[in-house]
Design a protein with these regions (language model features):
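A C-terminal junction/extension of Radical SAM enzymes
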Residues: 147-212
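Conserved non-cysteine loop/helix-boundary elements of the Radical SAM core domain that shape
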Residues: 1-175
Length: 212
């Protein structure tokens, strides 16, 4: 990855580059940590900001399993702990989550996430403000001939939620972010002051950026 960036530096004018941005899944953990360390060592003094975005998606084991993720809740907790010593003043950590709309109805008739502890952990994680920013998306499912029967169940809301459930969960998670001090600077993006993604704002405004 470092060699790719160094090659880009040869062919593009990156003297005034404002942000290097990388996107990773949270596994394999040690490999991700090592990549972050190498990138920081090579580029931290050269560029003012290095942004790492991690596709967490959910803290709910059932949702993670249904969506084919390789990490479950305890593994994600360990991953987040391992990121703590890698946080620096020039490093921005973003975390991606998806509103799956997987809910149930309690005995009192309240609608809530199927795993209430997952919601509590999400709220505690957000309130800690360890994350500089969050990306929050809604689940989108499309027909696929290879897994047609499974996809029909997915789209029907049998596995995850209906569209209404998904939007309801998005609103719930969005409010948690806003209440914790994160500002909404794009439809799906929230950040602490001065931590919004430069590349998110730049490519939407058709300004110069290099995508690899």
């Amino acid at each position: 990855m470092i060699k790719i960036i160094e090659a880009a530096e040869i062919h593009f004018d990156m003297e005034n580059l404002a942000e290097l941005s990388f996107e990773f899944n949270p596994y394999p953990e040690e490999e991700i940590y090592d990549i972050i360390r190498q990138i920081q060592a090579r580029f931290a003094k050269k560029y003012p900001r290095i942004r790492f975005s991690f596709g967490i998606q959910s803290f709910d084991n059932e949702v993670l399993t249904l969506s084919g993720r390789k990490s479950l809740f305890l593994g994600l907790v360990d991953f987040l702990r391992g990121l703590q010593p890698l946080k620096t003043d020039s490093t921005v950590f973003n975390f991606d989550f998806i509103a799956f709309g997987k809910r149930n109805t309690t005995k009192k008739g309240n609608r809530q996430l199927r795993n209430q502890s997952a919601l509590t952990f999400f709220q505690n994680f957000v309130n800690s403000q360890f994350a500089d920013s969050f990306s929050l998306y809604t689940l989108e499912l499309f027909e696929n001939q290879l897994w047609k029967k499974k996809n029909e169940k997915l789209i029907s809301g049998e596995f995850f939620g209906t569209d209404e459930d998904i939007y309801e969960e998005f609103s719930l998670l969005k409010d948690i972010l806003l209440d914790a001090g994160y500002s909404r600077y794009e439809l799906s993006n929230f950040s602490l002051a001065s931590k919004s993604s430069i590349h998110n704002r730049v490519y939407r405004e058709m300004e110069d950026y290099i995508g690899i």
